[in-house]
């Protein structure tokens, strides 16, 4: 898979204010493609990253949703599950972040983020399918305040090994792909949480993961979507009760 080159960017875009309970909905199904996100949600961040990487800022409008003061119209008129992200496109609404990143990759212009190589494609499918289990393995001990489990360590070791499968780059498939988008928003947060709360550095003894984090922070489409680490830590302590 050749390296996917992201379109040039002028830096962070001016984000619209997140819409709360007192807000009015946008004019739905008026032909505008809209991506509904929460600016600090790791799942919504996945869709936000691919939008930016493919250079779709002028094609997909961001609509921020305040999850702490969620507007009733979002669940009633937009996405009945009430979660983010969701995408309004061609008169339809769809959700689930791992499905959305695949949809955006295949239905919009810009660099392709899944490989044609059959071996890499199969590995990509396997890793994307594992992403939810990885998230659960890393978040569960934090939320339950349990000790660092063998399952948690095994999940980190699994992605460390996965990052060594292909030698043509620092990412899961060598070059940047949907797999990296599926994992980076979770890795971003667990690195902060485990370091500050458990005094455990997830990169210790995992050089591939350390290199992955270093290199993905050179990708502007990702860094444009990041929040301040201490802000994310405060949110986790407040809303997930992880402290």
UniProtKB/Swiss-Prot annotation:
Residues holding glutathione: 70, 84, 96-97
Family matches, as InterPro entries: Glutathione-S-Trfase_C_sf (IPR036282), Glutathione_S-Trfase (IPR040079), Glutathione_S-Trfase_N (IPR004045), GSTL1/2/3 (IPR044629), Thioredoxin-like_sf (IPR036249)
A Pfam family the protein falls into: GST_N_3
Domain GST C-terminal: residue ranges: 117-240
Segments forming domain GST N-terminal: 31-112
Recorded GO MF terms: glutathione transferase activity
Similarity comment: family membership: Belongs to the GST superfamily. HSP26 family.
Name of the protein: Protein IN2-1 homolog A
